[in-house]
């Protein structure tokens, strides 16, 4: 078998392995943060490689990308904003607070 044919056979296998490895690494770099807000608990998935957070609010799964913030970490999709600083967070919908006084539960120090 020529080297070219061997490469054609092996290359897709190697590339699929890289994709699976990258997905595994990305899952390992995702943190689950548990907050207790005024009204209810909030579970937030923080995906550092993608610079986004995701959570369920009002029966919708939201994915918010990291935005510009003078202080703390701010994530938005244009409608919702998740803003955290230290162990506290707030969720806004169209500039109105919908989840307030969210306290991180069991923070890792």
Curated annotation (Swiss-Prot):
PROSITE patterns referenced in this protein's UniProt entry, alphabetically:
PROKAR_LIPOPROTEIN
Lipid addition sites, S-diacylglycerol cysteine: 18
Q: Which cysteines are joined by disulfide bonds?
A: 37-102
Say yes or no: keyword Membrane present. yes
What Pfam families would the database entry show? Answer: MliC
Please tell me whether the keyword ATP-binding is annotated for this protein. Answer: no
Q: What are the protein's UniProt keywords?
A: Cell outer membrane, Disulfide bond, Lipoprotein, Membrane, Palmitate, Signal
State the GO CC annotations: cell outer membrane
Give the membrane topology, semicolon-separated if more than one. Answer: Lipid-anchor
Query: Please, where does N-palmitoyl cysteine lipid attachment map on the chain?
Result: 18
Its signal peptide is 1-17
Please state where this protein is localized: Cell outer membrane
Q: What protein family does this chain belong to? A: Belongs to the MliC family. Type 1 subfamily.
Q: What does this protein do?
A: Specifically inhibits C-type lysozymes.
Subunit description = Monomer.
Name of the protein this chain belongs to: Membrane-bound lysozyme inhibitor of C-type lysozyme
Natural source organism: Escherichia coli (strain K12)
